[in-house]
Amino acid sequence: MKRLPAVAGSFYESDPKKLKMQIEWSFRHNIGPRDIPKQTYEKKKRDNLFFVVPHAGYIYSGPVAAHSYYYLVSEGRPDVVIILGPNHTGLGSYVSAWPKGEWETPLGSVKIDEEILMQLVKESEVIDLDEKSHLYEHSIEVQLPFLQYFFDDDFKIVPIVIMMQTPEIAEFLADAIYNVMQKNPDKDIVVLASSDMNHYDPHEITVKKDEEAIEKIQQLDYKGLYEVVEGKDVTLCGYGPIMVNLILAKKFGKKAYILKHATSGDTSGPKDSVVGYLAARFGS
């Protein structure tokens, strides 16, 4: 079963050569890390297990996303990348995993880790196996070319989209991921929370709203983050995935490190109506 790209040619370049250049542009951008990371091939225990990465068009959020990937790549190739994204389309189940096969992008195909996926399904009791949720959803797809640029097809993924973004669902998912990671100590597993920040306010308002959410992220306060999003009109689209990583970070004794916060006004556009983007890592 192959999932074909839904947003190649719109969110990112559909030509492989141009796509690689777009990824390099993201790393070298003055909002980005300004350098392309060197991948280590020495296998050692990974420190940064969990990340927040944005998922907009690369011309807008690519330079911010590059900060998270800089740290991920610098610690070497993971065996499995669990990618949690919000469900923008409203299709499918409350929590949906692509069941098997592979995902294709202009840079090639990446296989699903069906063994880890089925362990998560068994542990969580909230994950449905459902392709419909993923067919047109971009939040996971846009992460793959960044990973493929460095690791080719030498890693596997577990793609999960979350429509029901509540603290209770986040707790179920975090517990399941924690248990699976504990049961597979020989597998190098990282978890990406794919999310943009506040949407379509002027730059100054978006920065202020985002800062309220970022404060809760720094505190690993997942319920506080939920309250900010729900109670203060902070239109952060992937708060469910971020809540999962906040819970996981606390379980693993990790701290939050904000790598970069910017808006589309900083990267590629006018500042009267912007989207906020955050790169964060959770490590020692």
UniProtKB/Swiss-Prot annotation:
CDD domains assigned: MEMO_like
Top-level taxon in the UniProt lineage: Archaea
Entry-linked Pfam families: Memo (PF01875)
SS bond partners: none
UniProt similarity note: Belongs to the MEMO1 family.
Name of the protein in its database record: MEMO1 family protein M1425_2054
Natural source organism: Saccharolobus islandicus (strain M.14.25 / Kamchatka #1) (Sulfolobus islandicus)
